[in-house]
């Protein structure tokens, strides 16, 4: 009932290969993801929504083109209609990896309540030289094994909060998760929307 069918478009698919000691590998055909826009969403179906999760905007071409304008429009709409929002992040090796993600996040994070990137994705988006130094330091291994939460992860979380995210949950592989929240004033409306005290 909630699946959008578009005449002449093919279905997208993704397969994720997780190899120990390496970042995940994605096999992906974007299909109709390349043409998906906010206009494709039936807004009537959003009337009772409490949370809108948008997973992997980088595999949806229209979401990162024009500096993330379409993504901003969609997330802003959700916030204006009292819907809590969450979003995943970017695949560094994709076409989307060449987009200016820091500029896109600057536009979009003010409308995102829960931002859930991996530490590598986030570092790639906000600090590419640091990301490259992590890759070099890991020397073919898993970079997250060498990260220090205070000096490597915390600054990224703080940057996301400064850009407007209300809560940031950074996935750090086997070492675990790093969670940072904005101050209570910025998160205040979220409890009323979701019924949870963040």
Whereabouts are the PLM-identified features?
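Ribokinase/PfkB-type carbohydrate-kinase core domain
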Residues: 2-198
């Amino acid at each position: 009932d909630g699946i959008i069918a578009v005449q002449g478009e093919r279905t997208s698919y993704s397969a994720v290969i997780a190899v120990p000691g390496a970042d995940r590998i994605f096999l992906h055909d974007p299909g109709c993801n390349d043409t998906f826009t906010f206009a494709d969403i039936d807004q009537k179906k959003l009337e009772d929504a409490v949370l809108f999760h948008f997973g992997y905007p980088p595999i949806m071409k229209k979401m990162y083109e024009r500096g993330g304008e379409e993504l901003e429009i969609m997330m802003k709409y959700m916030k204006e209609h009292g819907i809590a929002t969450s979003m995943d992040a970017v695949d560094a090796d994709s076409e989307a990896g060449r987009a200016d993600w820091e500029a896109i996040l600057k536009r979009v994070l003010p409308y995102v309540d829960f931002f859930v990137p991996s530490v590598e994705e986030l570092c790639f988006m906000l600090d590419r030289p640091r990301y490259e130094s992590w890759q070099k330091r890991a020397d073919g291994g898993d970079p997250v094994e060498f990260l220090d939460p205070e000096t490597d992860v915390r600054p990224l979380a703080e940057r996301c909060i400064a850009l407007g995210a209300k809560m940031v949950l950074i996935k750090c592989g086997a070492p675990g998760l790093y969670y940072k929240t904005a101050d209570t004033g910025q998160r205040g409306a979220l409890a009323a929307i979701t019924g949870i005290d963040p």
